[in-house]
Amino acid sequence: MKAYKRVIRQNPPYEIEFNARIAMTEVMSGSQSKKMIRRLKRMAASDKNKDYLDQVYYAIGNIYMSQKDTLNAISAYEKGNSGSTRNGIEKGVLLLKLGDIYWERERYNDAQRCYGEAIGLLDKERKDYEELSRRSKVLDELVPYTDAVHLQDSLQALAKMDEKQRNEAID
């Protein structure tokens, strides 16, 4: 922690300062997670960081994951994905993490979306690239069928409703 503060005090180029601030949040103790999230959200709101939103929200998502708060982690990762402007390795890492969460939760459509985009952003030399590639191919084949099952389930649920409930659901 002291080393990161020392780096920031030396007025380095902004990208180095930014990375030091992100790294500081990762080494803070778990009891300071609310403080870390507030600090990162302030960073996300700053115009200086608009090109780094994927990294900021990735760090926020990781804090939530360390607290076993998957719902808020997914929300943070999705914000990082939608706010990303550079489409670099950082976004690929974020999408891989998000895809893994969706895979574990059996939300295969969302996992396919994340893995499909991540595969084009990440280096083929990564140790987990083969697994990413395998999952992406499996999901490309699986998702059309799971989508059909979800559609049929929804249609059958609508068919079982009385007319008033069905009309409310449709509207």
PLM features: what roles do these ranges have?
Residues 1-171:
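Acidic, polar-rich low-complexity tracts and alpha-helical solenoid repeat scaffolds
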